[in-house]
Regions:
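Sec-dependent signal peptide recognition
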Residues: 1-7
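C-terminal motif of bacterial Sec signal peptides marking the signal peptidase cleavage site
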Residues: 12-15
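Bacterial signal peptide processing site
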Residues: 17-19
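Acidic/histidine-rich, surface-exposed loop or edge segments in extracytoplasmic proteins
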Residues: 23-37, 99-101, 172
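Active-site/substrate-binding loop(s) of hydrolase catalytic cores
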Residues: 91-100, 108-236, 242-255
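Hard-cation-handling environments
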Residues: 256-270
Length: 270
C-alpha cells in the first residue's frame, strides 16, 4: 500500500513538473550570433531543431528514410493544429508548402533562413493563415554538409566555412530527382509523396556568379509548356510575380548561364 501511494505521489509530481518554455532554449541561430558570414554545421542544425521542437508545440521533427551518408533526412513541420491523427493525412483543407534546403550545402542561405523562419513562425513574429502547413527538409545533402571546407568556392562571397557540392557518393543531387540513383533522392520522394505539397520551394542560390539582382527566376519557356499552362505562365504568373516583387523593391530578372561568351550571341534558356 505504501509503495502504491509513493508511486501515485511520484506520478502526480511528474505530471505537475514544469514543461520546457521557449525561453529555456537558446534559439538564436549561429548566423545571427556571428558576423553575418557563418553558417551552422550539420550537427548545429540538428541540435537547433531539436530545441525548437521541444520549445513549441507547433514545431515537430521527423526522421525519414536514409541518405548516402547513412543519416536520415530531417523533416521539420510547422503546424498550428496538432489535433490531427496524422498531420499528413488530415481531412481539413490545408495549403501545404514544402521547402528543400541544402541540395548544395555551399549555397547555405536557405538553411539559415529556414531556421530563423521556423522560429519566427512558432513564436508569432511571422503570422500565417490557420490553413497553411509548412514543412522543410533541414539539410538535403547531408554528406556534402559534413564535408566542410573553405576553398572550393573561392569566387563566392562567404560563408567562411561551408559544405561541399557533391554528396557522400559525390553525386550532384540537383541531377538525380528522376534517376534516383542516390538514397537521398529516394528519401526525398518518400517525403514528397507523404506531404503531397501544393507548393515546393527549393532554396537554391548561385555559386559565386556576380548577379546584380538578389533574386532571379527560371521559368519554363511558355512556348515549350504550351496550351493553357503556357498562356497562364506567360500572361499571369510571371508578370504578377515580377510586379509584386518590384513593389517590394525586390526586382527580379531571368536567370542565365554565362560561360565566357559575349551577350550578343544570346543566352540559353531551359
Amino acid at each position: 500500500m505504501k509503495a502504491a501511494l509513493l508511486s501515485l505521489v511520484f506520478l502526480i509530481a511528474l505530471s505537475c513538473a514544469e514543461k520546457p518554455k521557449p525561453e529555456d532554449f537558446d534559439l538564436i541561430t549561429p548566423f545571427e550570433k556571428g558576423n553575418g558570414n557563418q553558417t551552422p554545421t550539420y550537427d548545429e542544425v540538428m541540435a537547433y531543431y531539436e530545441d525548437l521542437d521541444a520549445a513549441y508545440v507547433s514545431i515537430k521533427t521527423y526522421k525519414i528514410g536514409r541518405t548516402d551518408s547513412g543519416e536520415p533526412l530531417t523533416l521539420v513541420t510547422y503546424n498550428t493544429n496538432r489535433t490531427f491523427d496524422s498531420e499528413f493525412a488530415d481531412a481539413k483543407e490545408v495549403t501545404r508548402i514544402l521547402i528543400n534546403n541544402g541540395i548544395h550545402p555551399g549555397e547555405s542561405d536557405g538553411i539559415d533562413a529556414t531556421m530563423m523562419m521556423m522560429r519566427d513562425l512558432a513564436n508569432g513574429t511571422i503570422e500565417t493563415p490557420e490553413n497553411v502547413w509548412i514543412g522543410a527538409i533541414a539539410v538535403y545533402n547531408i554528406g556534402g554538409a559534413l564535408n566542410r571546407n573553405t576553398g572550393t568556392r573561392a569566387n563566392q562571397n562567404g560563408p567562411e566555412e561551408y559544405g561541399f557540392r557533391g554528396n557522400a557518393q559525390n553525386y550532384d543531387l540537383n541531377r538525380d530527382f528522376v534517376k534516383a540513383d542516390t538514397y537521398n533522392a529516394r528519401a526525398f520522394a518518400e517525403i514528397y509523396h507523404m506531404v503531397d505539397p501544393d507548393v515546393l520551394i527549393d532554396n537554391h542560390v548561385s555559386n559565386g556568379a556576380d548577379y546584380q539582382y538578389v533574386l532571379t527566376h527560371l521559368f519554363t519557356q511558355h512556348n515549350k509548356l504550351g496550351d493553357e499552362l503556357g498562356d497562364y505562365l506567360h500572361t499571369e504568373l510571371q508578370p504578377q510575380l515580377e510586379q509584386d516583387l518590384a513593389a517590394k523593391d525586390w526586382p527580379i530578372t531571368p536567370y542565365v548561364n554565362v560561360f565566357s561568351q559575349v551577350p550578343e550571341i544570346g543566352f540559353s534558356q531551359f
